[in-house]
Design a protein with these regions (language model features):
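Phosphate-binding glycine-rich loops of NTP-binding sites
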Residues: 23-62, 190-193, 267-276, 291, ...
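C-terminal lobe/lid and adjacent interdomain/linker elements of RecA-like ASCE P-loop ATPase modules
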Residues: 2, 297-385
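Electropositive, glycine-dotted interaction segments
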Residues: 89-225
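P-loop (Walker A) phosphate-binding loop of NTP-binding proteins
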Residues: 11, 30, 286
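Phosphate-binding P-loop
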Residues: 16-22, 273-275, 307
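Conserved ABC ATPase signature
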Residues: 210, 215-218, 225-275, 280-293
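Conserved P-loop NTP-binding catalytic core
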Residues: 40-106
Length: 385
């Protein structure tokens, strides 16, 4: 199942967003245009649906509803998210979940529901506020999505949204996890617990996935011959990734993750996440620390690794190399264009000049990136200290 359509109102950078989504989505825009905030809408729904989450925590973790609400919002201050779930982009609507949020005008100023609605096919499953909500307004501080006793009729939606994962690997966290003390972030968005996740996977699946990753790394990383997962009993059972490199010695040279390059660690984290499960995956700038030749192959690699289980992947990027792949289509590319009234989001295929240039043989990277360049960029050269 995938999110086939999303509508946002007054969410972060956006006054209004209304776009269809496919199995693969590329988010393209200048700095501070809202690419991360667009992805955060999916994480927000996940934080409501997951165990130990809920509406109050999801809003509180983001600094309150006033921090979430678009700065350009005026007469209509409600924050709204509406997602359509389908088995594929070509199939009809399977589920639809919509939520609107307000803030109390006095007292604790808690966020509460303006509405919560669920449809299955064309049938309305839930429409809040209902009579019980009107009798007890405190009920509107919680969604039915987060309550096991209340979401029985649409638990498939809750399980799907709870499964959304986000990845933006920080190599230093993998290389030196014990140097960063304190509780980790929920969902491990930066890969700190990658080795623990690998260790918890059953042995057969672990070997299969590591073999596939090894095959890719042998192409991308010179002299790498073998990748394995080991547990060092001398260190009290601490897990490690170990690579064998071709060397003048017959057995080769061994290195552990603390000696891997940033690019190698990011590639391992990316490939493992793509193999991990069928839930939607949010990737933040996967091109970082990678050689340009590898980056150019990422779209095709992601497509091959996800086409079997139809996993949805949403990718934010600044990379011309990543978008140079002729397989990246205008229908799966969203252009984010900032303005004083908020960022607009449109598919690249909606621009006639982009369609014409693509028909002429250019790539999305050639035609889309120049369109979203900030104005007056040449003035940056005039900057003096």
């Amino acid at each position: 199942m995938i999110v086939s359509h999303i509508t946002l109102k007054n969410w972060r950078n956006f006054q209004v967003v209304d776009v269809p989504l496919g199995d693969r989505v590329f988010l393209v825009g200048p700095n501070a245009s809202g690419k991360s905030n667009f992805l955060d809408a999916f994480r927000f729904l996940r934080d409501i649906a997951k165990a130990g989450g809920g509406l109050q925590r999801a809003v509180g973790d983001r600094g309150g509803l006033s921090k979430i609400r678009c700065l350009a919002a005026r007469r209509y201050p409600d924050v709204e998210i509406d997602v359509t779930l389908s088995s594929s982009p070509d199939n009809g609507i399977k589920w639809r979940y919509a939520i609107g949020m307000k803030q109390q005008t006095r007292g604790a100023r808690k966020p509460f529901l303006a509405y919560e609605r669920v449809w299955q096919d064309a049938n309305t499953i839930l429409d809040r506020p209902d009579d019980e909500d009107r009798r007890d307004a405190e009920r509107l501080t919680q969604t039915h999505l987060e309550q096991i006793s209340a979401n029985v009729d649409f638990r498939e939606v809750a399980r799907f949204l709870e499964s959304v994962s986000y990845l933006h690997v920080v190599p230093q966290l993998i290389r030196h996890p014990r140097a960063f003390t304190g509780p980790g972030l929920p969902g491990d968005p930066f890969g700190r617990s990658l080795l623990e996740r690998i260790g918890k996977t059953n042995d057969r699946t672990k070997r299969s996935r590591l073999k596939k990753i090894e095959t890719a790394l042998r192409i991308a990383v010179p002299q790498l011959k073998k990748l394995s997962y080991v547990v060092d009993s001398a260190e009290g059972g601490i897990p490690h990734l170990e690579a064998v490199y071709d060397h003048w010695r017959p057995q080769g040279a061994k290195q552990r993750e603390s000696e891997f390059s940033d690019g190698t660690l990011r590639l391992v984290g990316l490939l493992w996440s793509l193999l991990e499960r069928e839930a939607p995956l949010l990737l933040e700038e996967p091109e970082l620390s990678l050689n340009a030749a590898i980056v150019r192959k990422l779209p095709a690699l992601i497509h091959r690794m996800t086409r079997k289980n139809r996993r949805q992947v949403l990718i934010s990027t600044h990379s011309a190399e990543l978008l140079s792949d002729k397989g990246v289509g205008p229908d799966e590319t969203l252009l984010l264009v900032p303005s004083p009234e908020g960022t607009t989001v449109r598919r690249a295929s909606e621009y006639k000049d982009i369609r014409d240039l693509l028909e002429g043989g250019l790539s999305i990277g050639d035609v889309a990136l120049p369109r979203i360049d900030p104005e007056n960029m040449q003035q940056l050269l005039l900057f003096e200290t």
